[in-house]
Amino acid sequence: MADVSANRDPQIKAGEIQSYLVEDSVHIYRGVGVCVNTDGYATPMGDDSGSVFVGVALEGVDNTLTGHAQGGKRVRVQMPGNAVFTKDTAAQTDLGLPVYAGYDGTVVVAGSSSHKVFVGTIIEIV
């Protein structure tokens, strides 16, 4: 295969918006990571067994109020693209490392994650 020798238009697809049913008795805050649990319901991002990261909440949804039920509310989520998360002790040498769901809206590296809920790759330290 020949080396690239000219500019080309990138084939990039921006993250899309998806709506998910919310798990019972959870409050998802706008701007935090969202996972889907093993029952298929949205929860705040966390290092939970069987969870899958699906994106960032575009709105807050409180499914703890009177009359709450599993799937009783929906949350709109911006699907994977680029997002800013907090990582303790981030360093320039972390660029390119995979990160996994921590708790309280944070991400961690592999050694600090029990269930390896993959969130993405570090592309910038801010």
What feature does the model see in each segment?
Residues M1-V126:
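Surface-exposed, low-hydrophobicity beta-strand/loop segments enriched in small/polar/acidic residues
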